[in-house]
Amino acid sequence: MRALALAVVAMAVVAVRGEQCGSQAGGALCPNCLCCSQYGWCGSTSDYCGAGCQSQCSGGCGGGPTPPSSGGGSGVASIISPSLFDQMLLHRNDQACAAKGFYTYDAFVAAANAYPDFATTGDADTCKREVAAFLAQTSHETTGGWPTAPDGPYSWGYCFKEENNGNAPTYCEPKPEWPCAAGKKYYGRGPIQITYNYNYGPAGQAIGSDLLNNPDLVASDATVSFKTAFWFWMTPQSPKPSCHAVITGQWTPSADDQAAGRVPGYGEITNIINGGVECGHGADDKVADRIGFYKRYCDMLGVSYGDNLDCYNQRPYPPS
């Protein structure tokens, strides 16, 4: 009786915690790249990922030809190993790079793990594509490459950590909720080159660091630096969706978006990040550079690019 009772309790827990998927739920995928069992429940053991498994049967985002795990075995660490990280950001520690030694794999993984939906939403290819897109956009923001650079221009991401090596404007706008601190500058720092007090303030609040009073932390603490980039990536700023929602297929364009030519794909992320400068006026070298990084990283992760890579014909979002 006791064994039977425990079995019933265990089944009840599964029933409460499981999320239906597959044919039993209209083809829905499990969250966090879990396997969908033949019975329509999500999990990561052989009961879910073995015989009859309906989707994401590799048991995580690290299926297929993905390089070996670094040992973390979940999330972004199951997609990109330390050695692959070094290959993708091949020259980030070059003597010519101002950020030499700053951007580490451990800081990248630690910051990513603070945002558990990053690289764990959707199927294995979607997870890989998100990693490629994030590293591509941030590589463009921090690039030290040029057309004839050794190993090509797209091997030089993460070369810088501060806009113009710190010789930049203050970037302070009057915002009562995010007041600028005396003597502080809010120029571009970190992988996403976070800029302006109205971004430093909420980013710091979200990650638990007072970046209004200590913006230099983004250029001195690598984990904090990466966290600001993931904050920007994961956070919608209306009317813009989050970059995460776009690359994982969770964003549906509104009527205004459709009228503006904004469509799902990597190009929409460029519009979110810097559309006012780069989008809506035809071919643009900066957009092409972002695409070049993205294609290289997708190729290294063994995943397709998806559609709509540029924003040449997308109208930028209105200023916030």
UniProtKB/Swiss-Prot annotation:
Similarity comment text for this entry: Belongs to the glycosyl hydrolase 19 family. Chitinase class I subfamily.
Entry-linked SMART domains: ChtBD1
Gene3D superfamilies: 1.10.530.10, Endochitinase, domain 2, Endochitinase-like
Tissue expression profile of the protein: Expressed at low levels in roots, leaves, sheaths and meristems.
GO molecular function, one term: chitinase activity
Signal peptide residues on this chain, from the entry's feature table: 1-18
Taxonomy, superkingdom: Eukaryota
Protein task: Hydrolyzes chitin and plays a role in defense against fungal pathogens containing chitin. Inhibits the growth of T.reesei fungus on plate assay.
Pfam family, any one: Glyco_hydro_19
Keywords: Carbohydrate metabolism, Chitin degradation, Chitin-binding, Disulfide bond, Glycosidase, Hydrolase, Plant defense, Polysaccharide degradation, Signal
Active site: E141
Disulfide partners: C21-C36, C30-C42, C33-C61, C35-C49, C53-C57, C97-C159, C172-C180, C279-C311
Stretches assigned to the Chitin-binding type-1 domain: 19-59
EC numbers for this chain: 3.2.1.14
Coiled coil feature spans: none
BP GO terms, sorted: amino sugar metabolic process; cell wall macromolecule catabolic process; chitin catabolic process; defense response to fungus; polysaccharide catabolic process
Cited PROSITE patterns: CHIT_BIND_I_1, CHIT_BIND_I_2, CHITINASE_19_1, CHITINASE_19_2
Protein's recorded name: Chitinase 3
Reactions catalysed: Random endo-hydrolysis of N-acetyl-beta-D-glucosaminide (1->4)-beta-linkages in chitin and chitodextrins
